[in-house]
Regions:
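Single conserved hydrophobic/aromatic residue that forms the stacking wall/gate
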Residues: 1-18, 23
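Conserved Q-loop
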Residues: 15, 77-79, 143
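Conserved ABC ATPase nucleotide-binding domain "signature" region
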Residues: 19-20, 50, 135
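Short catalytic/signature loops enriched in Gly
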Residues: 97-181
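Conserved catalytic motifs of ABC-family nucleotide-binding domains
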Residues: 31
Length: 181
């Protein structure tokens, strides 16, 4: 799987991509069971990105790896993940299997995120960005951090922090809209 050479890494592959690939190889050389991948393919060209994602998936199967894959690119998340957690201002607002989350998002922030992902089957659709300014993570709003931008916000959302609760087996959301009336 790996080979070592006296050639310095910068001569094998140039720039950021080469050094990132060498870092990945070094991380795998110790045969980990768990690997944190923070924006692991963000700086890569789309064609290289696809190859690296396929490599990640192959290695997951061959080496029985578990990844914590952190990414802002939802198409990458959908492609590589079995489960997804969506965060807003440092708090998990939804957790579900990848298939469930992308098919039927529950939390208003997750819905807004997925609504902004361009899709071929919705080419003629007008995309409306989430309204309002993103609050500062250093001084987040009271209550639900998403309430200033949420179209469903109530006074309860402004005053109380919703807890991440199971809404179905293997699925959790932090939203007061899930409470039964």
């Amino acid at each position: 799987l790996f080979f070592f050479t006296p050639t310095p890494p910068y001569q094998i592959l140039s720039g950021l991509v080469g050094s990132e690939m060498c870092i990945r190889d070094s991380a795998l050389a110790v045969q980990p069971e768990f690997l944190v991948c923070d924006e692991a393919v963000a700086a890569l060209d789309v064609s290289i990105q696809a190859q690296v994602l396929n490599l990640f998936m192959d290695l997951r199967e061959q080496l029985n790896l578990t990844y914590l894959f952190i990414s802002h690119d939802l198409s990458v998340v959908e492609h590589i993940s079995n489960r997804v957690q969506i965060m807003y201002l440092g708090r998990v607002v939804e957790s579900a299997s990848t298939e469930e989350l992308f098919k039927e998002p529950n939390h208003p922030y997750t819905q807004a995120l997925l609504n902004e992902v361009p899709r071929l089957d919705l080419r003629k659709r007008n995309y409306t960005p989430v309204s309002g300014e993103i609050p500062s993570p250093l001084d987040p709003p009271s209550g639900c951090h998403f309430h200033p931008r949420c179209p469903h916000a109530t006074s309860k959302c402004r005053n109380e922090m919703p807890v991440l609760k199971e809404i179905a087996p293997g699925r959790a959301s932090a939203c007061f809209l899930n409470e039964s009336s």
